[in-house]
């Protein structure tokens, strides 16, 4: 399971790259999508590699992401009881495990919003115009994507940047 995050905006982007990002539903900065790894996805990632960062997400980070940021129809979070009614999974951990094992696709989660919105990373990005290998932020980062996602899930802050009470 790959986590893909858009790190650069739309200004000055070539049309074919913009179309590819749109197909992946990465229309705004700090949006994340979960994708199953295959040859088509790898080709799309290579095309948009200067505008996104991606890597393999682990179970704990995926559970944290789903629990804190996954929205369902009407921009609602679900409790674990409501999650069981909607999806048949008893907990967010079971849902995360099924996604990682490939038992279900992210698009098969009933009424789930396909894009996960994140806050900007605490401490900021490195350099968005440089690749991750060169000390920047864009491109493939492997399992280090988990650290970035954890920096982008700020506890106590909702999706609109307001403090939760």
Swiss-Prot record:
What InterPro entries does its record include?
A: Ribo_uL30_ferredoxin-like_sf, Ribosomal_uL30, Ribosomal_uL30_arc, Ribosomal_uL30_euk_arc, Ribosomal_uL30_ferredoxin-like
Q: Which residues form a coiled coil?
A: none
One Pfam family here: Ribosomal_L30
Q: Name one GO biological process term.
A: maturation of LSU-rRNA from tricistronic rRNA transcript (SSU-rRNA, 5.8S rRNA, LSU-rRNA)
Give Gene Ontology CC terms. Answer: cytosolic large ribosomal subunit
Q: According to the UniProt entry, where is the signal peptide?
A: none
Source species, domain of life: Archaea
Single GO molecular function = RNA binding
CDD domains per the UniProt record, alphabetical: Ribosomal_L7_archeal_euk
Alphabetical keyword list: Ribonucleoprotein, Ribosomal protein
> In its keyword annotation, does this UniProt entry include Cytoplasm?
no
Q: What is the similarity comment for this entry? A: Belongs to the universal ribosomal protein uL30 family.
**HAMAP family assigned:** Ribosomal_uL30_A
Q: How the protein assembles, per its UniProt entry?
A: Part of the 50S ribosomal subunit.
- Name of this protein: Large ribosomal subunit protein uL30
- The gene that this protein is the product of is rpl30
């Amino acid at each position: 399971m790959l986590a893909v995050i858009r790190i650069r905006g739309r200004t000055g982007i070539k049309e074919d790259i913009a179309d590819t990002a749109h197909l992946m539903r990465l229309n705004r900065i700090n949006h994340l999508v979960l994708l199953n790894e295959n040859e088509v996805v790898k080709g799309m990632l290579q095309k948009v590699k200067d505008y996104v960062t991606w890597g393999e997400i682990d179970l704990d980070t995926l559970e944290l992401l789903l629990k804190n940021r996954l929205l369902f129809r009407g921009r609602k979070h679900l409790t674990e009881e409501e999650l069981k009614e909607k999806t048949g999974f008893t907990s967010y951990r079971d849902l995360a495990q099924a996604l990682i094992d490939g038992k279900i696709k992210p698009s098969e989660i009933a009424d789930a919003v396909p894009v996960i919105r994140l806050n900007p990373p605490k401490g900021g990005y490195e350099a968005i115009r440089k690749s991750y290998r060169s000390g920047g932020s864009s491109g493939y980062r492997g399992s280090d994507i988990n650290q970035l996602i954890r920096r982008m899930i700020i506890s106590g802050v909702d999706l609109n940047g307001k403090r939760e009470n």
